[in-house]
Regions:
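Extended, folded domain segments that form the structural surfaces/walls around functional sites
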Residues: 27-28, 33, 68-70, 78
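Alpha-solenoid HEAT/Armadillo repeat architecture
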Residues: 18, 34, 50, 73-76
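N-terminal flexible/basic segments that precede or flank functional cores
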Residues: 1-44
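Short, basic-rich loop-to-helix N-cap that marks the start of a DNA-contacting helix
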Residues: 75-88
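Short C-terminal boundary/hinge segments that cap the last helix of small helical domains
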Residues: 91-101
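Short alpha-helical DNA-recognition segment
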Residues: 50-70
């Protein structure tokens, strides 16, 4: 018997619920960075900021909570200095490594 599931009845997925420790956060960001998509990176940083508490991350980054939400939308292209401030506030850093040939 095939049971059809109404997609609209499924709960929304929220990655922030699964980002409880540094190792998970690092793995998540590493995977996101491989996509080479600024909007996806912004959204991922937003997920992590929500997991850690948006207000405290905004305060640590030196920007308003509203500006942080705006900068970390999936349709945004955040400036590097904003990404860097948010990463510092989150306790992570972006690392450069050679591209394997």
């Amino acid at each position: 018997m095939n049971t059809k599931v109404d997609i609209d009845s499924l709960p929304d997925f929220d990655a922030a619920q699964y980002l409880g420790d540094e190792a998970t956060i690092a793995a998540y960001l590493t995977d996101i960075l491989q996509a080479n998509d600024a909007g996806l990176l912004a959204a991922a940083l937003g997920d992590i900021a929500r997991a850690r508490g948006m207000s405290s991350i905004a305060e640590s980054a030196g920007i308003t909570r509203e500006a942080l939400y705006k900068a970390l939308r999936a349709d945004s292209a955040p400036r590097f200095d904003t990404v860097n401030k948010v990463c510092t506030a989150l306790g992570v850093r972006l690392v450069v490594e050679p591209i394997a040939a």
